[in-house]
A protein has these predicted regions:
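N-terminal membrane-targeting/pre-transmembrane regions
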Residues: 1-41, 121, 137, 147-149
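A residue-level signal for beta-strand positions that form part of recognition/binding surfaces
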Residues: 4, 68, 129
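Non-transmembrane, membrane-adjacent beta-strand/coil modules in membrane-associated proteins
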Residues: 78-141
Length: 159
C-alpha cells in the first residue's frame, strides 16, 4: 500500500467571507461611534479598544486551522484542531460518492464531526460538499472549497 497523498486541503476558520464581513462591520461601527463621541466621554476609548480587538482576533482567526482533509491509502483522513481526533473514512466501505450543495441556507456554522440525523458533517466554508454514503446508510458530508479535485481524488482512490 502506498502512503502517497493524492489530495490535501486545509480549511481555516477566519477566511469565510460573510463572518469576516460581519466582524469588520462591527469594528467599523466601533470606530465610527468613537469618532462621534465627545472628548469628555471615556466610553469612546473603550470602543476604540474593542474595534482594534475585533480586527486582531479576525487576523488571528485567518491563520487558525479548522481541519485538514487528505485522501491517501484508499481512505479519507480528516484531522482538526488540537483536541479533535483523527477521523478515517475507509473508501472500501463507500457505496456512493456525489458532489452536492452543502446546505440550503446562506449562513452555515463551521462544524467538525457533527453527528445529526444519520449524517456526519465536516464544514468550514464554501457552498459545495462531497456526500459519501457507506454500506450502513450513514452519510458523510464533507464541505470543500476544491470540490472537483476532491471528488476526482476520491473516485481515483476507489478504483
Amino acid at each position: 500500500m502506498s502512503e502517497k497523498t493524492v489530495f490535501t486541503e486545509k480549511q481555516y476558520l477566519g477566511r469565510e467571507f460573510i463572518p469576516l464581513t460581519i466582524r469588520l462591520a462591527l469594528a467599523m461601527f466601533c470606530f465610527a461611534v468613537d469618532f462621534f463621541t465627545d472628548e469628555r466621554e471615556r466610553s469612546g476609548d473603550l470602543l476604540m479598544v474593542v474595534g482594534f480587538s475585533i480586527i486582531v482576533i479576525s487576523i488571528f482567526m485567518g491563520f487558525l486551522l479548522h481541519f485538514r482533509t487528505r485522501v491517501q491509502n484508499k481512505s479519507v483522513l480528516i484531522d482538526g484542531l488540537w483536541t479533535t481526533r483523527l477521523v478515517k473514512i475507509d473508501l472500501n466501505s463507500i457505496v456512493k460518492v456525489e458532489k452536492n450543495v452543502y446546505s440550503k441556507y446562506l449562513f452555515n456554522n463551521p462544524v467538525y464531526n457533527l453527528h445529526s440525523k444519520g449524517t456526519i458533517r465536516f464544514f468550514t466554508a464554501g457552498k459545495e460538499a462531497i456526500h459519501l454514503t457507506d454500506r450502513d446508510g450513514l452519510v458523510y458530508i464533507i464541505g470543500s472549497q476544491q470540490v472537483n479535485e476532491f471528488l476526482r481524488a476520491i473516485e481515483g482512490e476507489m478504483k
